[in-house]
Regions:
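N-terminal cap/lid segment of alpha/beta-hydrolase-fold proteins
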Residues: 54-109
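Primarily recognizes the serine-hydrolase "nucleophile elbow" in alpha/beta-hydrolase
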Residues: 170-229
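Conserved alpha/beta-hydrolase "acid-adjacent" motif
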Residues: 274-280
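Catalytic nucleophile-loop/oxyanion-hole region of alpha/beta-hydrolase
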Residues: 127-135, 145-186, 310-317
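Mobile cap/lid helix-loop segments that gate and shape the active-site cleft of serine hydrolases
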Residues: 78, 219, 223-256
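Short beta-strand element of the alpha/beta-hydrolase
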Residues: 111-121
């Protein structure tokens, strides 16, 4: 019976991921990445209008807030990233499910630096395809191997934040232990993540002698972020050890900054983010600088949580800013 229950939990998690991905590809947004829905009168309205109002986010000066946005490639054409060899590797098995590394291989005469990419999804949905284009772009254009990591999600059997963080560290360890066959330099790597993935990427970067961290709309102080500290979601509460303050502090990147060899940080956020406060990125940037590290903070006024996605007109700007930052620091 336990085996069947575990299988059922895994199927539910996979279905949630599939539904979330589908919704993400069909959701209307304006160019600020705010979600739109039809208003029944031939126009549009903000899906979360009441939430913006409650958060006192003034829309009065945004004349284009109800105009749908559709991404059209400008600088980022498919020829820049298509054709990269990708291999899927099972790096870990746990509680009846497999965890996968999707490795986008750089073509290089010498062992390549590599990036670890961690997807968002509130620690409970989505998959490791979210950074595929950036990973393959850097593999093809910059000789940087990309490692897109799947990790234990909150609905899966035995899931806790500590288990998920261990997955991240085990993924890194797997790549380093197999550096020769993957043709990578085990000492030259960085982390990138979005939202919950930015939290995990930051933990991984601070604990591992990483060269750099790129975080989009990330959670870095879990004792202050509303998505954790004020959550009413029973599954998330259990995942975070019943919101035990010691646990939240122990897994907060702002408390994990090393005394030396601090990873260079590029932190991106939008001031109208309803999911994660932009202040989270500001706090980590300040903390890194106070310890003598490098932190580049890119704040986008009026932009919502998914400003780094194709639902935002800043997607390509953030994409190439990230690519340049990664190439500069992975030396």
């Amino acid at each position: 019976m336990k085996k069947y229950l575990s299988l059922l939990c895994l199927v539910c998690a996979m279905l949630g991921t599939a539904i979330g991905v589908k919704a993400q590809t069909t959701q209307l947004t304006n160019h600020y990445a705010m979600k739109l829905i039809e208003d029944g009168q031939g126009g549009y309205k903000l899906l979360q209008e009441a939430h913006y109002a409650k958060a006192r986010m003034d829309m009065s000066k945004l004349t284009d807030v109800l105009v749908p946005y559709k991404y059209e490639p400008q600088r980022l054409t498919s020829k820049l990233y298509k054709g990269v060899e990708t291999v899927d590797i099972v790096y870990k098995k746990a509680n009846g499910y497999e965890l996968i590394l999707s490795v986008d291989k750089a073509v290089s005469d010498k062992p390549a630096p590599f990036m670890i990419y961690l997807h968002g999804g509130g620690w409970r949905t989505s998959n490791n395809g979210s950074s595929k284009i950036l990973s393959q772009y850097l593999a093809k254009q910059a000789g940087i191997t990309g490692v897109r990591v799947s990790y234990t999600l909150a609905p899966q059997p035995g899931a806790t934040i500590q288990v998920t963080i261990q997955d991240v560290m085990d993924a890194l360890k797997y790549v380093q232990n197999h550096a020769k066959e993957l043709h990578v330099d085990p000492s030259c790597f960085g982390f990138l993540g979005m939202s919950a993935g930015a939290h995990l990427a930051a933990v991984g970067a601070m604990k591992s002698q990483a060269k750099l961290l790129v975080g989009y709309s990330g959670i870095y102080d879990l004792q202050k972020a509303k998505i954790t500290a004020k959550t009413k979601d029973a599954q998330r509460i259990a995942y975070f050890d019943q919101l035990n303050p010691k646990t939240l502090a122990a897994v907060s990147p702002i408390n994990l900054i090393p005394q030396k060899n601090i990873p260079a940080c590029l932190l991106v956020c939008g001031t109208y983010d309803l999911t994660v406060e932009c202040e989270q990125s500001k706090m980590l940037a300040d903390a890194v600088k106070q310890k003598g590290g490098e932190a580049v903070l890119s704040v986008y006024p009026f932009y919502d949580h998914n400003l780094s996605s194709k639902g935002s007109d800043k997607m390509e700007e953030i994409f190439f800013k990230s690519a340049d930052f990664i190439q500069k620091n992975l030396k």
